[in-house]
Regions:
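Short glycine-rich anion-binding loops that position phosphate/pyrophosphate groups of nucleotides
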Residues: 30-33, 154, 183-184
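Structural motif
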Residues: 25-27, 55, 146-148, 179
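Short, acidic/small-residue loops that bind anionic groups at enzyme active sites
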Residues: 44-66, 73-79, 207-211
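C-terminal active-site/capping subdomain that shapes the small-molecule cofactor and substrate pocket
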Residues: 164-214
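Conserved anion/nucleotide-ligand pocket segment
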Residues: 72-135
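ATP/NTP phosphate-donor binding region
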Residues: 1-22
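Oxyanion-binding "anion nests"
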Residues: 122-160, 166
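N-terminal glycine-rich "phosphate-gripper" loop used for MgATP/nucleotide binding
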Residues: 27-36, 57
Length: 214
């Protein structure tokens, strides 16, 4: 099926891991879809007493937002299903973050970068999930934040629509910076979009002075 179990089963398994003081980190096995169906009901009262790293990306963005609203950090990074496809540098970065060796940041030399200096809380995740979470109670606070986005297997015009939504709703104007992660396997629709994904994103933030990193 689409999910690894029923909503009840998945909720109770995750809640048990959040509550367990002996658990130091929770690695979500894979992305896809389904976290939004259970994360709103999670209880973080015991998690606050024994916080732990939560690791994942894509669909796990909704869980990251819940952790953020509980006042804690989490790690947007590779999951076990993808470990065999992830480069060593990224895995080393994940290890460094988990064990406090470094902040895990990687350098970028993209020609699309908009150079500058900024400060802010790093928030974000999968663009499609962020778009779907607009106005939910556990949506991120974007004021003076550095937003990080990534996505997979989307049409270019979908990326444009989501970025324009974030612009129209004031999210992009409130940021202090934007980091664009991997935008993999982007597709063209029946009417091909003439711009690259990077150009679509830069067009959405062209009115703002903050730096953009690809």
């Amino acid at each position: 099926g689409v999910f690894a179990g029923t909503d009840s089963q998945r909720f109770h398994d995750l809640q048990e891991a959040l509550n367990n003081p002996e658990v130091r980190a929770i690695f979500c096995a894979r992305g896809g879809y389904g976290s939004i169906r259970i994360v709103g009901d999670l209880d973080f009262s015991q998690f606050i007493q024994s916080p732990k790293w939560i690791v994942g990306f894509s669909d796990i963005t909704a869980l990251h937002a819940r952790v953020y609203n509980a006042g804690f950090m989490s790690i947007h990074a590779a999951m076990p299903k993808n470990f065999d496809k992830v480069d060593v540098e990224s895995l080393d970065s994940l290890y460094a973050m988990l064990f406090g060796i470094s902040n895990g940041l990687l350098e970028s030399n993209s020609v699309y970068n908009k150079i500058g200096n900024t400060r802010g809380t790093l928030v974000g995740g999968n663009l499609s999930v962020l778009y779907s979470m607009r106005a939910v109670p556990f949506e991120y606070s974007y004021a003076n934040a550095i937003l990080c986005i990534e996505d997979l297997n989307e049409y270019r015009y979908h990326i444009d629509r989501m970025m324009q939504n974030l612009k129209a709703s004031g999210v992009l104007a409130s940021l202090s910076g934007l980091v664009v992660g991997e935008m993999l396997d982007m597709k063209q629709g029946a009417d091909p979009h003439k711009y690259e994904v990077e150009e679509i994103i830069l067009d959405a933030v062209k009115d703002y002075s903050y730096p953009v990193c690809f």
